[in-house]
């Protein structure tokens, strides 16, 4: 049987000369030779010549599709040379493109390596623990160092000529911003670094674990099942009965032929991711509070008012003024409650809020630990003061005498004022001195500084001093209010709630069970990520409930024995 050959189909009209002619004109088309190569046969002769080659004239385009190879018997025209030059340029362009792609791939490879190395560094557990300890240390330091004071306070308390502990001066406090610890670049930078570590750990460790845990992995080998942490064999048992019992224990059960896979507690695998997200929420809320909040304080006498925006100061670059800052606050009344010993027990402020149109939008009486909240602004009752005394002298008045705070050692307050009895324009003014520690009682002294008596503002009883009848009409107190906007508080609260929930969920055990029906025997294996002793006990209780199968012959024997 002859071997098939490759057929070279030559155009008989083409010239076979191979001499190089002169350069033709562009318009002249050179003669050419068309060769059809058929790949459905192989050559019988050796070498590359024409010996042993069967030639057949077949018109181009008929029969099987064949590859055309065109040879020019003469040099191509100038225009075609230009096309050839374009081919060379095209080849050069392809070469440049390959070089560019090679450089791009090298750059991408470098980025991938750097990213992988960075993720590996950030997800390092000792690094994350060190970051948390550093943040805790800074928080503790922030409770020791008085926050938000004027620079002169730190100059005085941490002088350079007498450093605290021999080295701590005001420079150690003010330079890194520890006078505002929770908005300092050091503290916020550590928070950002810890957040990056948590995200890297989640991406490189927790998410792959969850992906693996979600797969339904059947085991088709009894040897693989016996390698699990818990392994047991049940002779004369059915895998279907085992699946029903597992579902009764809260397992999700899947079967495929003789194989069974069951699991429960998958939420415990998701919980670490939730813990990380909750911690990131807490840190994001704390950062927003430090850089996007407003804070202010004001002392307002009873009966006066103020605009919220006039007393608020931004704390960071993310602090944006809300519309609620145009709200006006009016102090309707300020009063205090006292213990039997006379000490102040609680103080109250009756406040009304008015919008730009003068309409009252809210009214509330606030006290310590019971603030007013409106439009994202919280108004706290934090302090009190003595604003003025209303006094009548010899039936004239009442006169409003401003009470000035007097500095004392200790926490007790003392306020004082003077009712002049002579011309106030003289250089040596004398008068009646009045002192008070609270709004209940006023102590009076004459021009010589001698004690005269005590009067309660509510009694309105007159007292004779240096020939003048004095009546204390009223004591006007002032309320000390702290105002704050903190957009990060809802985020922090949500983060703490999620942290508590996900921490509890993380204690759920993720248990997995595999089983294989091997003839009449069921091979069972299982593992869990925590509570391994409890899992072993649960498996023993579970397998004790799997019914044993009895064959028909055994039933007959049992029936005969019972009959006899």
Swiss-Prot record:
Region (Disordered): 1-36, 76-99
Membrane topology classification: Multi-pass membrane protein
Keyword Plastid tagged: yes
Matching Pfam families: ResB
Disulfide pairings: none
Location of the protein in the cell: Plastid, Chloroplast thylakoid membrane
Matches recorded under InterPro entries: Cyt_c_bgen_Ccs1/CcsB/ResB, ResB-like_domain
Transmembrane segments: 125-145, 184-204, 270-290
The entry's keywords: Chloroplast, Cytochrome c-type biogenesis, Membrane, Plastid, Thylakoid, Transit peptide, Transmembrane, Transmembrane helix
Keyword Cytoplasm carried by entry: no
Cellular compartments per GO CC: chloroplast thylakoid membrane
Biological process, per Gene Ontology: cytochrome complex assembly
Transit peptide residues according to the UniProt entry: 1-38
Subunit structure: May interact with ccsA.
Family note: Belongs to the Ccs1/CcsB family.
Function: Required during biogenesis of c-type cytochromes (cytochrome c6 and cytochrome f) at the step of heme attachment.
Listed name of the protein: Cytochrome c biogenesis protein CCS1, chloroplastic
Organism: Oryza sativa subsp. japonica
Gene this protein is translated from: CCS1
């Amino acid at each position: 049987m002859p071997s098939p050959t490759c057929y070279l189909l030559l155009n008989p009209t083409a010239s076979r000369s191979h001499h190089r002619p002169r350069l033709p004109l562009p318009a002249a088309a050179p003669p050419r030779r068309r060769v059809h190569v058929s790949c459905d046969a192989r050559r019988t002769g050796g070498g590359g010549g024409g010996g042993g080659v069967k030639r057949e004239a077949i018109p181009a385009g008929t029969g099987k599709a064949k590859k055309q190879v065109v040879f020019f018997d003469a040099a191509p025209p100038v225009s075609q040379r230009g096309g050839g030059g374009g081919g060379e340029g095209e080849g050069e362009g392809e070469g440049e493109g390959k070089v560019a792609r090679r450089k791009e791939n090298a750059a991408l490879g470098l980025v991938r390596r750097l990213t992988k190395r960075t993720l590996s560094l950030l997800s390092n557990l000792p690094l994350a623990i060190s970051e948390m300890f550093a943040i805790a240390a800074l928080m503790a330091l922030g409770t020791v160092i008085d926050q938000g004071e004027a620079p002169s306070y730190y100059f005085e308390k941490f002088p350079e000529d007498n450093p605290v502990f021999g080295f701590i001066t005001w420079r150690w406090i003010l330079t890194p911003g520890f006078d505002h610890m929770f908005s300092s670049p050091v503290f916020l930078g550590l928070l950002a670094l810890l957040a990056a570590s948590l995200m890297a750990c989640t991406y490189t460790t927790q998410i792959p674990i969850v992906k693996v845990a979600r797969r339904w992995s059947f085991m088709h080998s009894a040897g693989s099942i016996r390698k699990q942490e818990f392994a047991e064999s049940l002779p004369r048992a059915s895998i279907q009965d085992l699946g029903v019992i597992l579902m009764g224990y809260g397992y999700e059960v899947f079967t495929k032929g003789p194989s069974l896979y069951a699991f429960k507690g998958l939420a415990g695998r998701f919980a670490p991711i939730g813990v990380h997200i909750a911690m990131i929420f807490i840190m994001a809320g704390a950062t927003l509070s430090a850089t996007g909040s407003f804070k202010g304080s004001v002392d307002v006498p009873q009966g006066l008012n103020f605009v919220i925006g006039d007393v608020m100061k931004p704390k960071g670059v993310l602090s944006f003024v809300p519309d609620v800052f145009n709200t006006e606050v009016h102090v309707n009344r300020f009063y205090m409650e006292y213990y039997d010993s006379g000490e102040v027990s609680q103080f109250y402020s009756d406040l009304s809020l008015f919008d730009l149109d003068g309409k009252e939008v809210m009214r509330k009486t606030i006290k310590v630990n019971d603030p007013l909240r409106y439009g994202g602004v919280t108004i706290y009752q934090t302090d009190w003061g003595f604003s003025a005394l209303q006094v009548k002298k010899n039936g004239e008045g009442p006169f409003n005498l401003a009470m000035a705070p007097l500095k004392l050692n200790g926490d007790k307050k003392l306020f004082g004022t003077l009712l002049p009895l002579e011309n106030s324009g003289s250089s040596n003014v004398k008068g009646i001195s009045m002192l008070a520690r609270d709004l209940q009682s006023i102590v009076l002294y004459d021009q010589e500084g001698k004690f005269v008596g005590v009067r309660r503002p509510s009694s309105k009883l007159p007292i004779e001093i240096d020939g003048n009848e004095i009546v204390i009409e009223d004591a006007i107190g002032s309320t000390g209010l702290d105002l704050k906007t903190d957009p990060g508080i809802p985020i922090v609260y949500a983060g703490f709630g999620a942290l508590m929930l996900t921490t509890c969920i993380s204690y759920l055990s993720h248990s997995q069970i595999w089983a294989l029906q091997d003839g009449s025997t069921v091979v069972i294996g299982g593992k869990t990520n925590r509570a391994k002793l409890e899992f072993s006990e649960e498996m023993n209780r579970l397998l004790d409930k799997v019914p044993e199968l009895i064959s028909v012959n055994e039933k007959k024997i049992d029936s005969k024995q019972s009959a006899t």
